[in-house]
Amino acid sequence: MAVQYNKLWKILIDRKLSKGELGKLAGISPNTMTKLRRDEIVALPILDRICETLDVDYGDIIEHVKKEQVQA
């Protein structure tokens, strides 16, 4: 399974928030923020904190992509 957080980064741009600011607001460790930047899977409670912080749903910040799309 592969995921992408491009939707999350777009929300941050639209709201003029940095990735670092999101990490601080949502209480996310720098290591986990690195996983997000690398489009790696993170624990559901982390995604829940992001959703609560930004007042969005899971589908607004993450999308599932087929492995063929990632490798292309």
Residue locations for each model-derived region?
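Recognition helix of helix-turn-helix/homeodomain-like DNA-binding domains
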Residues: 28-42
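Short, basic-rich loop-to-helix N-cap that marks the start of a DNA-contacting helix
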Residues: 39-52
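Residues in the helix-turn-helix
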Residues: 21, 32, 46, 60
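Short basic helix-loop element that most often maps to the first helix and adjoining turn
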Residues: 6-25
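Residues in the recognition helix of alpha-helical DNA-binding motifs
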Residues: 25, 36, 64
